[in-house]
Amino acid sequence: MPEVERKPKITASRKLLLKSLMLAKAKECWEQEHEEREAEKVRYLAERIPTLQTRGLSLSALQDLCRELHAKVEVVDEERYDIEAKCLHNTREIKDLKLKVMDLRGKFKRPPLRRVRVSADAMLRALLGSKHKVSMDLRANLKSVKKEDTEKERPVEVGDWRKNVEAMSGMEGRKKMFDAAKSPTSQ
């Protein structure tokens, strides 16, 4: 069956209109967030920084005020420097640890596992340690079985081969072979 082309549920012009509306809404939200951030920044600074009353202060009072402000700025700068140093140290340490992890991943590839034959003695040595000397000869408990000599039971007749060939030739030879094949089953 040939596939029928489906018409899109929404036309291209409608899609473009919706996209432009979404972009306009996103821009409006972004501008609103930006204004809120600026307002929050102004509010925070107003809370943290007290207004200075410099009117009516003498020269020595202004100099004392400047010294206090400079001392506060130095303390804040020292704290900022310490925090930056700690951050830099931590980022370097993280980077070094990441490199070590990458190195270790590259070095140790897991080999494909193979079956290994382990004797009972080797397994006990691995489990108990090398100090304990335990031998487990499992073959010692097995019964010994002698192989039966099948060749001794059947005596092989060795004769003149020419007589065998002459005896087996012709119809009588075939009859002898047929009778010989019958005789072991009948016994």
Curated annotation (Swiss-Prot):
Looking at the record, which segments are called Involved in binding TNC and actin?
97-118
Residues bearing the modification N-acetylproline: P2
Q: What is this protein called?
A: Troponin I, slow skeletal muscle
Organism whose genome encodes this protein: Homo sapiens
Spell out the disulfide connections. none
Which proteins does it associate with, and in what oligomeric form? Binds to actin and tropomyosin.
Residues recorded as bearing Phosphoserine in the entry? S58
Q: Which GO biological process entries does UniProt record here?
A: cardiac muscle contraction; regulation of striated muscle contraction; skeletal muscle contraction; transition between fast and slow fiber; ventricular cardiac muscle tissue morphogenesis
Q: Where is this region: Involved in binding TNC?
A: 2-48
Asked if the Swiss-Prot or TrEMBL record annotates the protein with the keyword NAD, the reply is no
Q: Describe the family membership recorded for this protein in Swiss-Prot or TrEMBL.
A: Belongs to the troponin I family.
Does Phosphoprotein show up as a keyword for this record? Answer: yes
> What tissues has this protein been observed in?
Highest levels observed in human skeletal muscle (e.g. gastrocnemious muscle), differentiated cultures of primary human muscle cells and rhabdomyosarcoma cells cultured in low serum medium. Expressed in C2 muscle cell myoblasts and myotubes.
Record-linked Gene3D superfamilies: 1.20.5.350, 6.10.250.180
